[in-house]
Regions:
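Inter-helical turn/loop elements of alpha-helical hairpins
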Residues: 2, 20-23, 28-50, 59-93, ...
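Generic helix N-cap/helix-start motif at coil->alpha-helix transitions
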Residues: 19-25, 51-55, 89-95, 122-129, ...
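Residue-level signature for tetratricopeptide repeat
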Residues: 31-32, 62, 101-102, 134-135, ...
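Residues in the short coil linking paired helices within alpha-helical repeat scaffolds
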Residues: 35-38, 71, 107, 141, ...
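Single-residue signature of alpha-solenoid repeat helices
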Residues: 39-40, 75, 111, 145, ...
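Canonical positions in the second alpha-helix
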Residues: 46-47, 81-83, 117-118, 151-152, ...
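Internal metal/ion-chelating core segments
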Residues: 149-246
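Helix-coil-helix junctions within alpha-helical repeat/solenoid scaffolds
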Residues: 241-453
Length: 455
């Protein structure tokens, strides 16, 4: 009979283990997940010898975070190993395992319902709450992100990472004042809390506080050195966005080379962050050299993924922008998969991802071979996708890439009145944005409004 070891995770939740040393691995998983620390990886070697439900479930989660077709088979193997061991476990551990099993099976709706129940019954299970937020985020369901975190407030109000979760939930719900308050509360407790820094960067970008946001992230950037590649690269991505808006294109390009695409070229989130930043740099008029060719070599293996529409669409743009035929393969796979997608995401795949994929392919191909460009087709397809864009997942800031590409296609198609109608409100909301002013200047010049172009 296996030994039963009773321990607690960092937030006092009981865990049932087979080996005393596994307690540190579970703590590393929880702290690493919430704080984007590489200690999250310690759960994998622990899972080799400890077949307890919580250890195997955490290992399954880690494999699912690969966001690739390789993840679910590995995750199922860990869940099966725990089932075969048939060891004791708490009800909370069983609920968490059930939520992860739903995720592995592709039933995100059932997984989210289980995470909501966990948040209500075990409000200090912040890892389960954050995982629930991850699912809601990928479905474009910001209110559920916020509601999950609010369940924890009475029990965990003095935990910095909870306020990071609250801040991002509020920000995605467009409640910027509350988002900033929670982010600053988290940072007062823990100045290097990366998710709170991230949420505050979102607030400042949306608020048009571009110089302030750039200075804030620049000052915080040394604190990202020990984080996972995603968090280090993603916060650097946010810093680069501020730099592009302010016209510091050279600094943004350096961040692309050194941080955003300089860490882990195999990981999904690092890859789409690189695609997004490189596209934004190019849209801002920056010559990026042969970077698309190099980036696309790491995307060629993604054509059969269909894990999340948000990911597939950016893989497709990167492949097409480099002129690779795999972009056509990925488009065909998106169209084939869309009617078969899990129920919770099927509408987003069919109504948003498919038209967006056509528009992205047309835009990228037009950039690769201008003589063969079909800018009206790119503009029309992207325009058809925009109303439902939130459903593909990603943040407001991340999805803005598709809006920028749509505007660019409209402008290249000569539809300047439509561009003016969309771009002038952006200029009003972002008076510090040199990028927006430059584009608006060209639009007004093309419209024969030189006085407005000079303004």
């Amino acid at each position: 009979m296996s030994t039963v070891v009773h321990a607690q995770d960092p937030f006092g939740n009981a865990v049932t283990l087979q080996h005393p040393t596994s307690a540190a691995a579970v703590a590393g998983f929880v702290d690493g997940f919430l704080g984007y620390q590489p200690g999250i990886l310690a759960i994998l070697p622990a899972a080799e010898t400890d077949h307890s439900l919580i250890v195997q479930t955490c290992a399954a989660v880690l494999w699912m975070f690969s966001e690739s077709p390789a993840g679910p088979p590995k995750a199922r193997w860990h869940l099966a190993r725990a089932a075969a061991a048939a060891g004791p476990a708490t009800e909370r551990e069983r609920q968490f395992a059930a939520a992860v099993a739903h995720w592995v099976a592709g039933d995100i709706g059932a997984a989210l319902a289980q995470h909501e129940a966990l948040a209500q019954q075990h409000p200090r299970d912040l890892a389960a709450i954050k995982l629930g937020q991850y699912h809601a985020f990928n479905l474009g369901d910001a209110p559920t992100m916020l509601r999950l975190a609010l369940h924890a407030v009475p029990a965990a109000q003095h935990v910095a990472s909870l306020h990071g979760l609250l801040a991002f939930g509020y920000e995605q719900c467009h409640r910027l004042g509350q988002a900033e308050a929670h982010a600053r509360y988290a940072l007062a407790m823990q100045p290097a809390e990366p998710w709170a820094q991230h949420a505050l960067a979102h607030v400042m970008l949306t608020d048009g506080r571009l110089a302030e946001g750039a200075a804030f992230l620049q000052q915080a950037s040394p604190q990202w050195r020990g984080l996972t590649s995603f968090m280090r690269g993603h916060n650097s991505w946010h810093l680069a966005l501020f730099q592009i808006e302010l016209g510091d294109d050279a600094a943004a390009l350096r961040l692309y080379d050194d941080e955003v695409w300089g860490l882990d070229k195999s990981y999904s989130q690092d890859q789409v962050g690189a695609v997004s930043l490189l596209a934004r740099l190019e849209l801002a008029g920056v010559a990026v050299g042969e970077r698309w060719d190099e980036l696309a070599t790491h995307l060629s293996c993604r054509t059969a993924d269909q894990v999340q529409p948000f990911l597939d669409l950016q893989y497709l743009y990167g492949l097409a922008r480099a002129g690779l035929p795999q972009a056509d393969t990925l488009l065909a796979n998106i169209q084939r998969f869309a009617p078969l997608a899990p129920a919770a995401a099927r509408a987003a795949w069919q109504r948003v991802a498919v038209p967006a994929a056509h528009g992205l392919l047309a835009h990228a191909r037009g950039m690769f071979k201008p003589a063969q460009a079909d800018w009206p087709a790119a503009a029309d397809a992207l325009g058809a996708a925009l109303p439902g864009l939130a459903g593909i997942g990603g943040s407001h800031a991340q999805r803005e890439l598709f809006e920028q590409l749509h505007l660019d296609a409209l402008q290249r198609a000569g539809r300047l009145a439509a561009v003016q109608n969309l771009l002038q409100p952006q200029a009003n909301a972002q008076p510090q944005s040199l990028r927006v002013r430059r584009r608006l200047h060209a639009v007004y010049a093309g419209l024969g409004l030189p006085a407005l172009a000079a303004g």
